[in-house]
Amino acid sequence: MKKVRAIANIIIVAILVGLTVVAIPFTSSVRASVNPNVIYQGDTNNNKVSFMINVYWGTEYLEDMLDVFDLYQIKTTFFVGGSWVAKNVEMAQEIYKRGHEIGNHGYNHKDHDKITEQQNYDEIHKTHLLISANLGIEMNLFAPPSGAYNDTTVNVATGLGYRTIMWTHDTIDWRDKNTDLIIKRATKNLSNGDLILMHPTKHTLEALSAILAYAENNGFQPTTVSEVIGE
């Protein structure tokens, strides 16, 4: 891990100079929300950004990802699914012990815009209780699985004390197994207050050091979602 920073800088130069043609277009989900409880981007008046991690699978990559964040002395936000936590309590505790923020990602990775008000409540509240019991913390950030939500979802989340977190840029790393492409999507047009969506995958792990190095080398401060949105 000691050579990671130097290698990351080399990777950045090679990718950002050489990767001029991308088969799949860069995807950004920036859009204004009329609901103040749905957040797509944080405070654009400061240099903070968040490379947030959504977790339902990919447990085998998390330890190494945590090591990379430690190397750069960066804390971020992990939105964890309740069903994942139930099977991986020790790893969830390890993420929290390392100083990272924990967010609610529902319980069963359902499309929250397709379920009832009661089901929305159950998904969010059950996860809240599970994490509180095992980590001893309270949470106030909810990331709907697949970014699927409607007014009912937001109202339920708000009633439970949550703000609904979306993203500014989506790396689509769960689908596209391409390290260079993940780096490009995470860093292209990076701006103050951006929220970048990532997952624990093999190629995301390979890309992570280069992404963090790029952010720091370009004057950004990677941190937790709460820090970016000013909570």
Where are each of the predicted segments found?
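Active-site beta->alpha N-cap acidic-glycine motif
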Residues: 29-111, 115, 119, 123, ...
